[in-house]
Amino acid sequence: MFIIELIKGIILGVVEGLTEFAPVSSTGHMILVDDMWLKSSEFLGSQSAFTFKIVIQLGSVFAAAWVFRERFLEILHIGKHKHVEGDNDQQRRSKPRRLNLLHVLVGMVPAGILGLLFDDFIEEHLFSVPTVMIGLFVGAIYMIIADKYSAKVKNPQTVDQISYFQAFVIGISQAVAMWPGFSRSGSTISTGVLMKLNHKAASDFTFIMAVPIMLAASGLSLLKHYQDIQIADIPFYILGFLAAFTVGLIAIKTFLHLINKIKLIPFAIYRIVLVIFIAILYFGFGIGKGI
């Protein structure tokens, strides 16, 4: 049984790594895979299972931090200075990168404020299967609208051309995505695209902006609940973290490589299919009624 439970922990880490930064809602997938199927709360206990999810989320966040490590060093003015993307060598030599620490801070402010004010309320009242399905569906529609609009934009901007106003508006959409199932990356990438960034630029800024705020949020949650960690459960935490980190690295790099080509609509369609599947399990078979 111990081996089976370890495998379940690895599976949850893999799911977290695949979905945390993809625009598909990691919350929706964790409800489907864990709460409706694997039920980590049964072999870890409800409190320890909650802490386990914080740990594997940190694995995904560290993966994103590693992928963007050079960007973070540049934003903090550590290491070599690079130049803005441009049409020719002269442009690249003459224009320093515009993305800086203030862009990131401006983008973090709305979600940071709402998180401090409403985090407990959201955790207590909005984490249910129906609310997650609503978030998945509405988020999918928003992504489709963004993609349809982006097709009309002739010269979308790169991440180094982002303005402080654009950063703030994208930050507001990150705050809206606190609704479970909406998806932080789905919301912010869509908003970035609507603000005339290209899909890769919107994704880059989304991940760069998300890393510090998620590190802070997960770190604070871990400090609150670290006493729930049992020595016997440590192997689950380690394997889950490593699975989330490793799979997260691959998923993030693959996503960033493909997003300008495939856009958001395939993810939106997937989300709608996921809503239908969860609805069948929930309303048709009563699975997850206690969540």
UniProtKB/Swiss-Prot annotation:
Its EC number is 3.6.1.27. One of its GO terms (biological process) is regulation of cell shape. Coiled coil: none annotated. Keywords: Antibiotic resistance, Cell membrane, Cell shape, Cell wall biogenesis/degradation, Hydrolase, Membrane, Peptidoglycan synthesis, Transmembrane, Transmembrane helix. It is a multi-pass membrane protein. It holds the Pfam family BacA. InterPro entries: UppP. GO terms for molecular function: undecaprenyl-diphosphatase activity. It is found in: Cell membrane. The chain crosses the membrane at residues 1-21, 48-68, 102-122, 126-146, 162-182, 203-223, 231-251, 267-287. Its main location: membrane. GO terms for cellular component: plasma membrane. It catalyses: di-trans,octa-cis-undecaprenyl diphosphate + H2O = di-trans,octa-cis-undecaprenyl phosphate + phosphate + H(+). Bacitracin is thought to be involved in the inhibition of peptidoglycan synthesis by sequestering undecaprenyl diphosphate, thereby reducing the pool of lipid carrier available. Belongs to the UppP family. Catalyzes the dephosphorylation of undecaprenyl diphosphate (UPP). Confers resistance to bacitracin. HAMAP family: Undec_diphosphatase. This is Undecaprenyl-diphosphatase. It comes from Staphylococcus aureus (strain NCTC 8325 / PS 47). The gene is uppP.
